[in-house]
Each structure stands twice: as structure tokens, then as C-alpha cells.
Amino acid sequence: MARVPRHRRLVLPLLCLLFQGATALLFAIFVRYNHETDAALWHWGNHSNVDNEFYFRYPSFQDVHVMVFVGFGFLMVFLQRYGFSSVGFTFLVASLTLQWATLLQGFLHSFHGGHIHVGVESLINADFCAGAVLISFGAVLGKTGPAQLLLMALLEAVLFSVNEFILLSLLGVRDAGGSMTIHTFGAYFGLFLSWVLYRSQLEKSRHRQSSVYNSDLFAMIGTIFLWVFWPSFNSAPTALGDGQHRTVVNTYYSLTASTLSTFALSALVSGDGRLDMVHVQNAALAGGVVVGTSSEMMLTPFGALAAGFLAGTVSTLGYKFFTPILESRFKLQDTCGVHNLHGMPGVLGAILGVVVAALATHEAYGDGLQSVFPLIAKGQRSATSQAVYQLFGMFVTLVFASVGGSLGGLLLRLPFLDSPPDSQCFEDQVYWEVPGEQETETQRPLRGGESDTRA
């Protein structure tokens, strides 16, 4: 493989050092512990240690953190020669995003007295932002370099934070599990980014855009981690007590239903009755996405099952039929199929939230209406008005994602960012020391010459 020019080899370390130096300076100026983290403030109030929010929120934070770094990272290792990059760049991009999101979300949500005040909830919210960025990463997986990904993360985190603030704080939209703010935003930001970065000569690397037995097995590890911890992901920001409990129950049942529908549809559409690991690794997770908005609401266990089954069905059909259409007709190369796992289920989840919000009544929620729909409980909105705001929130998210992704694509076209050439996409050796291996251009896909597109 040709030696990389010196100026291109310096781009990544310079960007890493520049970004870290800038965020460290901003942390020194603005970031302080909140009242539950600061030693003096906590003990001044004579609180019991067991009342500290850490003990209520940390288990959820730990699960979400594992999802971001292990779940997303390993879900994307299906590419036969891109495992180092899938896990390694996930590690890099998420680490930058966590710092940057802490600042952005802090300025918007917890800035007072001239400082940003952080605690365990700040860590959870930063992880959510990182999740959206990694969803977008899936759309351009294998076609972008690490320097490009760092700039993508910087831009996307800004737009994510602004969109989240508009929806949750200004519009009063309910979206605890992020069907809109995380999944829909991340998916369509990534899709429009990929559309702008379209590669007409990607066929030169198509033989690498496939899996082998072991890479699929490792990707399945990511799926299992995500599947098991998804109830924590959706419930982490919800009100303690019945709201968090209900969110876990709804997500749990929705995931089981999406798994069953995925296995059923995968066997049906294969032609020979065999299962496709692409479907199982991804569409089985759609149940967690589709109830993100409504999981804290009175969706009912039956509603969760129905939503999950529909999401698994739509996602599986998307992988089989819709992804090839996106590339052939719309020139949209979605490496991981994020449109099928996060995009369409995210939009379905937003619509489900509209319906469930419209049905909210004092009789159904009792005093719990205050924690789920505070504006309805205070008489400031009717259930119908809340539903309209939920729908409007979805359209705002789509606008932010599409415009932001398009602008991000233009930014990532800057020549000094060291994008891999068309003939070297989906290849670890471009950016990593790969021990004991030499590139073998004669490797062919194992699935009848078809490339994988999944999330």
C-alpha cells in the first residue's frame, strides 16, 4: 500500500490535540460540579448519601455507556476488513462527542451563575448525543476517514443539542427514549451526509463491503448488548418511579416482538426459507427504537407488542427491498442501513407518540399525568394540542437533520481531510497497522456477490 504523504499523516493528530485543547480550556472556564457532586454543597445541605442522584441514575448510565461503546462499536464490525476502524473510530468519535456535548447541552440546559453544572445526568445526556452521532457514522461507515468523522461529530453535536433543546424545552415535546431526537435525527443526518458524499466509483471496493463468518459473529455480540440494555436506554431520563418502570416494561416487550417478526420476515423473503444474519443483527433492535417516544406513556403491553412487531417487519423489508432502491435510484449509499433500523422505525415511533399523546386523559394517568405530560396536567394544553406539538417536533427534527447532514457533507469534502480513495474503502490498512495481514484484492464476497447494507 502506498505511503501516506506527511501532511496527511499529521491531520488526525493535529485535530485531536486541537479539539482536546479547546474543550479542556472551555471546561476550565465554564464547567463545575452540580450540587449533588460538589463536596461542600452536598454536605452543606445535610443530605443522606443514599438520596444522591448517583444511586438512582448510575445503573442506567452504565448500561447506556456500554451500549454506546460496546453495542454500537461491535454492531458495525460486520465488514470483513474494517473491524479495527468500526470499533476504534467509534471509540474516538464517541470520546470527543461526550466532551463537546457536555458543553453544548450544559449551555442550553444547566448554565447558571456563569457556569455549567454537571452530574450523572449530564453524562447520560452526553451519551445520547454520542448515540446519534454513531448512528450517522453507520451511514458513511468505511467511506470516511477519522479526521472527517471528528468534524462530523463536532457539527452534528451542535445541531443535535439545538434540535433537542427546541423540542424538549421550547415545544414541550415528550421523547424520553429519543425516537425523534436520537434515532430519526441521527439516521437522516447520516443519510443526507452520505448523499452529498456519494461515490460513483465505489464498485472498486465493493468486494470488501461484505462479511465473513467471524465478522458477523462479532457483530451479533453488539446486537445482544444493545438488545439487553435498550430498556435502560429508553428509561434513563424518565421520571423515577412508575414512569421509569413503565418504560422498561414497554421497551422489553417491544423488543421481543420485533425479534419474532424479524425472524419470520427474514425466512419469508429469503426465497429458500433461510435466515439472513443482516436482518437478525439489526431489525430485531427496531422494537427499541419505535417505542422511544411513547415508552413512558400509557402505551399498554399490547401496544408495545404491536409496535415492536410492526417495526421489525418494516425494518426487515427495508433491508431486503428498500436499501437497494436508495442506492440505485437516489444515489444514497447507506453502508449500515441506518434508514431501516433507525430512520423508518424512528419516524414510526414519532407517529406512535402522536397517537398515544392524543389519547392521554386524567382518568388514564391520574396524578401521574404531571410527570408524563406536565403541560396537559397544568391545563396549558389539551391532549390534541400535545399531539400536534409532537408531530411538529418530528418535522423540525427532519429539517434539522436533512439540512445539517447536507452541510456536513459539503464540509467533509474538504481535500485536506484525507478521505480514503474509492479503491481503498472498507479497508483497515489505510489507517491502521494490521498485524500479519496483507491486502488481498482477490477476496470475494461470500454472499453470492452481494454487499452488505445494514445498521
Curated annotation (Swiss-Prot):
Localization, UniProt: Cell membrane; Basolateral cell membrane
GO CC entries: basolateral plasma membrane; membrane; plasma membrane; spectrin-associated cytoskeleton
Glycosylation site positions: 46
Region (Disordered): 434-455
Expression by tissue: Expressed in kidney by connecting segments and collecting tubules. Also expressed in liver by perivenous hepatocytes. Expressed in the forestomach and the fundus of the stomach. Expressed in duodenum, jejunum, ileum and colon at the level of villous (at protein level). Specifically expressed in kidney where it is restricted to the epithelial linings of the convoluted tubules and the loop of Henle. Also detected in ovary. Expressed by hepatocytes and dermal hair follicles and papillae.
Matches recorded under Pfam families: Ammonium_transp
GO molecular function, one term: ankyrin binding
Superkingdom per UniProt: Eukaryota
InterPro entries per the UniProt record, alphabetical: Ammonium/urea_transptr, NH4_transpt_AmtB-like_dom, RhesusRHD
Key word Glycoprotein present: yes
Gene3D superfamilies hit by this protein: Ammonium transporter AmtB like domains (1.10.3430.10)
PTM statement from Swiss-Prot or TrEMBL: N-glycosylated.
Membrane protein topology class: Multi-pass membrane protein
Region (Interaction with ANK3): 413-421
GO BP annotation list: ammonium transmembrane transport; transepithelial ammonium transport
Keywords: Ammonia transport, Cell membrane, Glycoprotein, Membrane, Transmembrane, Transmembrane helix, Transport
Activity control: Inhibited by amiloride.
Keyword Membrane: yes
Cytoplasmic side: 1-10, 80-83, 143-146, 199-216, 270-279, 323-343, 412-455
UniProt catalytic activity: NH4(+)(in) = NH4(+)(out); methylamine(out) = methylamine(in); CO2(out) = CO2(in)
Comp. bias regions, Basic and acidic residues: 441-455
Transmembrane segments: 11-31, 59-79, 84-104, 122-142, 147-167, 176-198, 217-237, 249-269, 280-300, 302-322, 344-364, 391-411
Role, per record: Ammonium transporter involved in the maintenance of acid-base homeostasis. Transports ammonium and its related derivative methylammonium across the basolateral plasma membrane of epithelial cells likely contributing to renal transepithelial ammonia transport and ammonia metabolism. May transport either NH4(+) or NH3 ammonia species predominantly mediating an electrogenic NH4(+) transport. May act as a CO2 channel providing for renal acid secretion.
Similarity comment text for this entry: Belongs to the ammonium transporter (TC 2.A.49) family. Rh subfamily.
Quaternary structure and interacting proteins, as annotated: Interacts (via C-terminus) with ANK2 and ANK3; required for targeting to the basolateral membrane.
Protein name, UniProt field: Ammonium transporter Rh type B
Native source organism of the sequence: Mus musculus (Mouse)
Protein's gene: Rhbg
